[in-house]
Amino acid sequence: MKNGKLYLKVALGYLLVLLFALMLLTSCSADSGQNEESGRRIIVDQLGRAVELPETIEKVCATHIYGGKMLFAMGQIEKIAFQMQIGADTEAVAVVDEHYGSLPTVLSSPQGTDSPEGLLALGVNLVFTDVSKGEEATEMYQNAGIAAIAVSGETFEEVYETARMMGEVFECPERADEVISFIEDLRNMISSRLAGLPGEERPVVLVCGSGGVYTAATAGMFQHHMVETAGGINAGAQLSGRWANISAEDIILWDPDFIVLGSTFGVDDVDSVLAESALKTVKAVKNKEVHIFPSSLGWWDFPLPQSVLGIIWTAKTIHPDYFEDVDMLEMADRVYEFIYGYTYTELGGVL
C-alpha cells in the first residue's frame, strides 16, 4: 500500500512538471506569434533607444556625414531619398551614377531636407541621426512619424556596431560582415607592419581640424585612434571634447614631430603653418613636417568608412620606410570601389 501511494506521488509530480513545461512553451510561442503576426521589428540604436522599424522601409537618409557614408558602404543607394550634402565624394557619385544623379537635391526639394516635414514630403520613413546631437534631436523626427536611429563612429568598435545595426535594419548582415572584414584587414596590414615598433620611434602627431592649426583632435575623437593605429602619439591625448582650442604655447610644449591638417577646406594650409612665426621653434615646423590629407574627394580623417585611408596615409607619412611599397592612389581606388561601386579615379579624384 505504501508503495502504491509513493508511486502515485511520483506520478503526480511528473505530471505537474510536464504541465508547467507545457505552459512555458505555450507562453513563449504565443509571444513569438504575436511579434511575427504584427511584423514588429525593434532595434536598439547607439543612444540606447528602442526604435520600432517601419514594416516596409521605403526611403532613407541621414542627417550627418557619417550616417550618409555608411548608407553607401552598406549598399543602400537605391533606398536613399535625395542627394545628401555630405561631401565631394558623393557629389562625384551623382555625376557618374544614373540613379543617384536622378534623385532630388536639397535645392530642388520643395520643402527642403532639413526638417521632418521636408523628409516626409520626400517619402522618408527612416532617418539616421547623429549621436552627438543627443536624444532630443533624434526624437524630433520620431515624433513626426519617421523612425529615427542614432549612430556614431568615433571608434572602430562604433563603426562596426553601426554596420551590424544597419545590416539588421536592411536585412543584409552579410554586407555588414564584409564592411567589418574589409576595414579590419587594412588595419591588420598596418599593425602587422608596425608590430614591435619601439615606443621611442612613435612620433608625436598634432592633428588639426578645419578651424586651423590652433584646434586639436582630443582623446575622444576618431583622429586619436587614427594616429595611434598609424604608430604615432596624439599630441592632444590629454584633451577632452571635440576639436579643442589650443594656443601656440601648447604646441611649443608638446613640440610635435608632425603636424597634420585635417582638411583642404580648413582655414590653414601647409604654407600658412610653416610661415606662422609663433611656431618657428616647433620641431614639425623646423623640419617642414607639416602635412595635409591629400584627398580631393571627401575627408579621410573624419569618422567615415573611407577613413581607413587616412590611417594608411598617416602611417606612410610618419613611418615611410615601413610603407614604401604602398601606393596611395591604388589603395584609394580599392577603398572607394568597395564603398561606392566606383574607384577613386573613376570619380575624378586626385592626390
Enumerate the language-model features and the residues they cover.
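Extracytoplasmic substrate-binding proteins
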Residues: 43, 50, 136-215, 236-238, ...
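Short helices/loops that flank or line small-molecule/ion binding pockets
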Residues: 113-123, 144, 246-255
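Short helix-initiation/N-cap motifs at beta->coil->alpha
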Residues: 46-48, 103-117, 154, 239-248
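Bacterial N-terminal signal peptides that target proteins for export
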Residues: 2-15
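A short, structured surface patch at a secondary-structure boundary
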Residues: 62-120, 126-131
